[in-house]
From Swiss-Prot:
Region annotated Disordered, chain positions: 61-93
TM segment ranges: 101-121
Subunit-structure text: Component of the TIM23 complex at least composed of timm23, timm17 and timm50.
Family: Belongs to the TIM50 family.
Originating organism: Danio rerio (Zebrafish)
Gene Ontology cellular component terms for the protein in this record: mitochondrial inner membrane; TIM23 mitochondrial import inner membrane translocase complex
Keywords: Membrane, Mitochondrion, Mitochondrion inner membrane, Protein transport, Transit peptide, Translocation, Transmembrane, Transmembrane helix, Transport
Protein name (record): Mitochondrial import inner membrane translocase subunit TIM50
SUPFAM superfamilies, A to Z: HAD-like
GO biological process entries: apoptotic process; mitochondrial membrane organization; protein dephosphorylation; protein import into mitochondrial matrix
Localization in the cell: Mitochondrion inner membrane
Record lineage: Eukaryota, Metazoa, Chordata, Craniata, Vertebrata
Length: 387
């Protein structure tokens, strides 16, 4: 082989290596293939020097492809993971710091509120001239005075909610020449006499139950009618005025007169200042008369039905008790204590009594008829014998 033929092959090989480096920089496969193709064509017509150049180029090409296919070094992945862990740690630290600051702020506000409450409610009461009113805590240390007065204030406030406002909720019975009815009827307002309804157009409204006027007119001569409701006075007072324009209701008692027990407003009959054997409580909740269960009559809750006749039947039931002169109403109401609808039970028993009375009358009439026929035959026989 001449030197002339070797020189072009070396030039071509160097050019191929240069192009290979440029192809590695742009990282595209087609230029590398273009380099291989002309070299392979040249090596087919040249000597062993061209084969050596082709082998070098193919080795470089394979190294470049392997470098592209290999994943990034583990050092880079660990670096990314460390960065992410650092960010998560920083975020957790910020969250913990924010929680700590919120708790500190809440503690400071709570402490300040407690100090303010003790200062406001633990101070001495003052009279109209602004002078302090002495109490049983004046001899204590100032801080102890504030704490004990605050405790007493909230204790009295709780007692005011739980206990009735007075041990005697009603005044003493009327004396002659005034008329005092022999029995006392205690009525609930909500869902017994009225039903609250709400609409978007009118807001809250109270529907009057059919038979209220009839109930008051029939029972006013026999019962001392008292409205005792778990509603507040501000809500109930105008409602009572609207349903009782003639003044049949003698007294009105509201939520503050109830005894708060286990989440219910209980009406304590013993605080009414009346003979408990003559008191009947009408409500739709049995818990309302839980302290004296045999003084109560639990009606079904009225849902606003305009065809309801319960108050008419209730008037008949209560009128029957009063006109019968029952000495202790608890002996009668005890029979209806476990009835889901005592008025329906009363109507069933009344119908049964009516059937029994009709049967008794018919039997008596039959006996009289038989006695009359036997007497007539005996009289005729006796008159004939004398003749």
């Amino acid at each position: 082989m001449s030197a002339v033929s070797v020189y072009p092959m070396c030039v071509r090989a160097s050019r191929g290596l240069l192009r290979l480096r440029q192809g590695a920089r742009c990282s595209t496969a087609p230029p590398l293939l273009d380099v291989v193709r002309p070299l392979s064509a040249d090596t087919s017509s040249s000597s062993a020097t061209g084969g050596l150049a082709q082998a070098i180029l193919q080795e470089r090409l394979q190294q470049q492809q392997k470098s592209q296919e290999q994943p990034p070094p583990e050092g880079e992945d660990s670096g990314h993971k460390q960065d992410e862990q650092g960010e998560d740690k920083k975020q957790k630290e910020n969250t913990a710091y924010a929680k700590k600051m919120v708790l500190r702020l809440a503690g400071i506000m709570g402490l300040g509120g407690t100090v303010g409450i003790v200062y406001i409610f633990g101070s001495n009461s003052v009279d109209e001239q602004g002078n302090k009113i002495p109490d049983e805590f004046d001899n204590d240390v100032p801080v102890i005075q504030q704490l004990r007065r605050t405790f007493k204030y909230f204790k009295d406030y709780r007692q005011m909610i739980i206990e009735p406002t007075s041990p005697k909720l009603l005044p003493d019975p009327l004396r002659e020449p005034y008329y005092q009815p022999p029995y006392t009827l205690v009525l609930e307002l909500t869902d017994v006499l009225l039903h609250p309804e709400w609409s978007l157009a009118t807001g809250w409204r109270f529907k009057k139950r059919p038979g209220i006027d009839y109930l008051f007119q029939q029972l006013a001569p026999l019962y001392e009618i008292v409205i005792f409701t778990s509603e507040t006075g501000m809500t109930a007072y105008p409602l009572i005025d609207s349903i009782d324009p003639q003044g049949f209701v003698m007294y009105r008692l509201f939520r503050d007169a109830t005894r708060y027990m286990e989440g219910h407003h209980v009406k304590d009959v013993s605080c009414l200042n009346r003979d408990t054997s003559k008191v009947i409580v009408v409500d739709c909740k049995r818990e309302a008369f839980g302290l004296q269960p045999f003084n109560g009559l639990a009606l079904c809750k009225w849902d606003g039905n305009s065809e309801d006749r319960t108050l008419y039947d209730l008037a008949a039931f209560l009128k029957t008790i009063a006109t019968s002169g029952v000495e202790d109403v608890r002996s009668v109401l005890e029979n209806y204590a476990h009835e889901e609808d005592p008025i329906e039970a009363f109507k069933r028993r009344q119908a049964q009594l009516a059937r029994e009375e009709e049967q008794r009358i018919s039997e008596m009439a039959q006996q009289k008829k038989q006695g009359f026929s036997l007497g007539t035959i005996a009289g005729r026989f006796w008159s004939r014998k004398q003749q």
